[in-house]
Amino acid sequence: MGASKYMQELWRKKQSDVMRFLLRVRCWQYRQLSALHRAPRPTRPDKARRLGYKAKQGYVIYRVRVRRGGRKRPVPKGATYGKPVHHGVNQLKFARSLQSIAEERAGRHCGGLRVLNSYWVGEDSTYKFFEVILIDTFHKAIRRNPDMQWITKAVHKHREMRGLTSAGKKSRGLGKGHKFHLTIGGSRRAAWRRRNTLQLHRYR
C-alpha cells in the first residue's frame, strides 16, 4: 500500500484512536488562528490531489473556519413585515452547505484567485474547518498547462458564488443517477416547469 493510499485509509476511520487524537489537537490549533488564513500545505494531500491540487506554482491552499448551526433571518428586531406564515426568524436552515460558505469566503478574500474545490479537515462543537484549493490564473505554470487552461477563462470568475463548484452543485441538486431526478433539465425550476406545462401540439 502506497503512502497516499495509506493516508486515505487513515482518514476513512475517523473514529480510530489515532485520528480522534489528531483531529482534537488540530481543531485546537485551528481555533487559535484567524477565521481565514493561508495554509503552507494541504492537511490532506491525498484528498487535495483527488480534487485537482498539484504541489506546483500557482496552487494555493486557504483554511477557513465556519460557525456551525442554522442561519438566523437578518431582520431588525424580528420584524419580517408579512403574513404570519413567513414570520420565522430563528429556526430557519440555510439552503447551502457550510462547505460552500467556506468556499465563498475564501473566494471573496482572494478576488484574484479562482476557487477550484474544497474539503473537510475537522470540526468541533462550534466550528467546522475546511481547506479551499485556489488557483492563480495569471501564473505561467497554470496558463501553459493544457489540463488547467479551462479555469483561466473569464467565464469561471467567482464560480464559488454561482454554485459551480462541487459543494455548490450539491445544494442545487445537480448530479448523476436516480437521486437527482428533480433537476433533470438543468435545475429544479427547469424540471418543475417542464412537468407542469401542458403542451398541446398542433399535430398530436
Swiss-Prot record:
Subunit field text: Component of the large ribosomal subunit.
GO molecular function, one term: structural constituent of ribosome
Location in the cell: Cytoplasm
Disulphides: none
One annotated GO biological process: cytoplasmic translation
Organism whose genome encodes this protein: Silurus meridionalis (Southern catfish)
One GO CC term, this protein: cytosolic large ribosomal subunit
Protein's recorded name: Large ribosomal subunit protein eL15
Superkingdom as given in the UniProt entry: Eukaryota
Pfam families: Ribosomal_L15e
Keyword set, alphabetical order: Cytoplasm, Ribonucleoprotein, Ribosomal protein
Free-text function comment from the UniProt entry: Component of the large ribosomal subunit. The ribosome is a large ribonucleoprotein complex responsible for the synthesis of proteins in the cell.
Protein family per UniProt: Belongs to the eukaryotic ribosomal protein eL15 family.
